[in-house]
């Protein structure tokens, strides 16, 4: 998608440099190219549409309060604005489909306040830095994405779940307490929202407003251990995966990979490429119980790694990281985000839909989710297979579109007020 009309970019640059300084605006061609892509190329369907848009300028505010200043100028001049954290989204969330201004929040990284049970930080704060800061007070983030290099704003606006979702659900399930957002109505000020009023901004790709600052929930910090186990067959591995739901206190993350995926993961003595791998982040006091469960159910514990590094190693092999590593080994694979009982109850039927299917599973709060990876031939093949999977009871979230699909009604309810000119990340909502 390209911009049809000529945008008043020069005028916008002058205004922003006057208010934010010369260094706030970047026109360097290499920087513009980098700011116009994310990880959408993991989808062969989206990859065929790339490049899908190019930034005309990148603006990097230094604080949350500078973000609405940028949006006021963009509103007055009619220039599209696409927010960007570290660009780690998988669905084209950060691609400026209509060109215009990419708003890079990476310098807005101040941890404003740590309280008992909450932390307030600017949108560009890296989650690793945020978690380290709150751990000094004996607390931790209850959920975070599999990549801790993500920003707080990027995770809230572009992400959904991750490590901790097994216990706490997604980032829309009470994780967010308050938001300060910049809307594109010409007002030039931050808008403060709390509780359920934050939901139209969570996983909305910045289409309803750009998150400038957030207060999120904390829990007490616990001692976690990363447990790596190996299994001879799919049934025993999935039985163990599901049985970990009974462990109290609950594990934080439980992931399963079939052997073909394990063989594509970075080499590690804790991973046996000839067997299925089930990995878990468990409370340290439950380690002995988990070891007994593995022995009783016919598996083998290959390693237990204590401390933050051990747990983060398990997290770094969860969710879409399995897709990344498999595609790195064999670029001919595509993936679907899947969920439902057939993933463990009828795996042969699931595998029969596409050639060379392999499964990565995640134990979630209410069901088993995962990634189905298979040999790609065409968009039609993918869509026909999706219909077959849905007919057998598998629910699907497609990573092959950059339009928003979740909680659309809540998003649309605030659009007329928050973005009357349709300038916030245009192209990410169905017409």
Regions found by a protein language model. Name each.
Residues 112, 127-128, 132-247:
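FAD-binding subdomain of flavoenzyme oxidoreductases
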Residues 4, 84-86, 93-100, 106, ...:
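Conserved glycine-rich FAD pyrophosphate-binding loop
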Residues 1-72, 88-117, 261-267, 308-329, ...:
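N-terminal flexible segment immediately upstream of the FAD-binding catalytic core
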Residues 25-29, 60-61, 81-85, 103-105, ...:
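General beta-strand structural signal in soluble alpha/beta enzymes
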Residues 16, 74, 240-246, 286-299, ...:
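Short amphipathic alpha-helices in soluble, non-transmembrane regions
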Residues 233-236, 281-288, 339-343, 374-379:
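Helix N-cap motif at beta-to-alpha junctions
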Residues 223, 240-303:
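A conserved active-site cap/scaffold subdomain adjacent to cofactor or substrate pockets
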């Amino acid at each position: 998608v390209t911009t049809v009309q000529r945008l008043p970019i020069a005028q916008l640059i002058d205004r922003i440099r006057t208010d934010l300084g010369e260094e706030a605006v970047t026109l360097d061609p290499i920087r513009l190219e980098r700011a116009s892509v994310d990880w959408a190329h993991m989808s062969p369907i989206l990859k065929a549409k790339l490049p899908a848009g190019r930034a005309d300028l990148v603006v990097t505010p230094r604080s949350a309060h500078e973000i609405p200043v940028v949006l006021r100028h963009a509103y007055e001049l009619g220039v599209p604005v696409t927010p960007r954290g570290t660009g780690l989204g998988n669905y084209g969330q950060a691609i400026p489909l209509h060109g215009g201004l990419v708003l890079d929040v990476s310098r807005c990284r101040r941890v404003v306040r740590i309280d008992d049970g909450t932390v307030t930080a600017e949108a560009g704060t890296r989650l690793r830095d945020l978690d380290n800061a709150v751990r000094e007070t004996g607390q931790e983030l209850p959920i975070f994405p599999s990549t801790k290099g993500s920003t707080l704003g990027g995770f809230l606006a572009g992400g959904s779940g991750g490590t901790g979702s097994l216990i706490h659900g997604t980032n829309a399930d009470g994780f967010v307490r308050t938001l300060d957002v910049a809307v594109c109505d010409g007002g030039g000020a931050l808008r403060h929202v709390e509780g359920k009023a934050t939901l139209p901004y969570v996983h909305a790709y910045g289409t309803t407003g750009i998150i400038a600052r957030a207060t999120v929930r904390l829990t007490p910090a616990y001692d976690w251990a990363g447990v790596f186990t190996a299994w001879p067959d799919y049934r025993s591995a999935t039985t163990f995966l599901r049985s970990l739901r009974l462990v109290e206190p609950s594990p934080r993350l439980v992931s399963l990979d079939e052997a073909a995926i394990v063989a594509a993961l970075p080499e590690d003595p804790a991973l046996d490429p000839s067997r299925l791998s089930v990995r878990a982040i468990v409370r340290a006091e439950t380690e002995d119980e988990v070891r007994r469960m593995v022995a009783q159910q016919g598996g083998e514990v290959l390693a237990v790694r204590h401390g933050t590094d051990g747990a983060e190693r398990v997290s770094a092999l969860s969710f879409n990281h399995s897709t990344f590593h498999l595609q790195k080994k064999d670029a001919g694979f595509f993936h679907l985000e899947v969920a439902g009982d057939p993933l463990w109850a009828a795996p042969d039927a699931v595998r029969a839909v596409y050639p060379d299917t392999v499964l990565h599973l995640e134990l979630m709060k209410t069901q088993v989710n995962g990634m189905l990876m298979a040999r790609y031939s065409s968009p039609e093949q993918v869509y026909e297979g999706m219909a077959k999977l849905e007919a057998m009871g598998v629910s699907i979230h497609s990573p092959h579109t950059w339009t928003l699909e979740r909680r659309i009604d809540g998003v649309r309810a605030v659009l007329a007020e928050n973005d009357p000119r349709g300038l916030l990340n245009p192209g990410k909502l169905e017409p």
